[in-house]
Amino acid sequence: MKPDELPEFIGETGHFSTIFDFSAHTLTDGEHGWYDAPKLEFAKWRAAIIQAQLETQKYGFKANIIENHDEPRGASRFLPSYAQTPEGIKMLGTVSLLLRGIPFIYQGQEIGMRNAKWNSMEEFDDISTKDQYHTAREAGLSDQEALEVCSRMSRDNARTPMQWNDEKNGGFTKGTPWLKVNASYEEVNVEDQEQDADSVLNYYRKLVALRKSDELKEVFTYGEFLPEYENMDGIMAFYRKDESKCILVAANFGKDAATMKLKSGIKKVWLSNRAEEMADCEADTLNLRSCEVVVLELE
């Protein structure tokens, strides 16, 4: 949607209260199909989110998503391989949920589900995935290459059964599920994460509670979005700011540690995805390790 169309759709007299923001998702759309889809570039992903946030806040709210039933798993799509870990998944979730707008969490996202491993096209159910396979083959890709494309981009990745425990079929059913269960269910499931205080699931609970807390719900709901450190490679950072509070959300998507100069002193560290270690903060300096995210209140 073009920026000048936003008032018509989500303004005070617009058609809708909100619309989903797919600006980052379209970055991996291919010109002719999935087979020529470009790899995600962090700088373009960051720029797309920032642009959407700055344009939308003039008129209303968009609904922010990492994934849904029509998209592959966000952890596999938006994170480089080295960041597809519990810490990296928590980092991605923090950035998404604390943007200005209405946050959505899709089933399985809160435990860090990633794309499944598909061994043949017969395992897919989605008709569009099968169409994309044939498009890739007609473009000259081998059977294995076309399968890899579909494995990466298919929405069936988000439609595998919810992983409740490490029992057969992930505890979802004793019958035959419509799709095979993601093989990760033995390591990634609700039951195990319920018992781990540092799990992705329990982190998401902290994150949601923080956004809804009496102290911060106003600034996270109505506060202005202001990007920061855009000149730093691998850093996604922004302020949520109103008349009474200035919150900095800073995430390091890069492989190497990064140091940022803060504009003011730190009043409080509200959240970090490194539970075993406090965020490395000095009076006016923030040091972030790879895949680390912090939520700070500044003076």
Where are these regions (language model features)?
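Active-site and adjacent substrate-binding regions of carbohydrate-active enzymes
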Residues: M1-E299
